[in-house]
Amino acid sequence: MPRIELAPEVFDDFDRFFDHQEKYGIEDTSGRIAEINEAIQVLAHSPLIGRKAKAGKRELVIGKESRGYVALYRYVPDIDAVFVLAIRSQRESGYK
């Protein structure tokens, strides 16, 4: 079973989500982060489940509509590890 590691930038992404949700009065921000973390755990069992992205990376689609996110990650089978590189809202363009 692959180990999952979050890049330091992912925590910046979470901070950005908190700021955005606070700005618009959205409740249950911590619940949304928990949903994202729970979805990422799927990669421990199925690291190739995400759609292919550029440069050997993959994207895991999490949730939908206003609760939709995309996690950019790379699976390295040689060391059996998944590196989550960034997370963005499905409504954002590109990664920060």
Feature map (PLM): residue ranges:
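Basic, Lys/Arg-enriched alpha-helical interface segments
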Residues: M1-R58, K64, D78
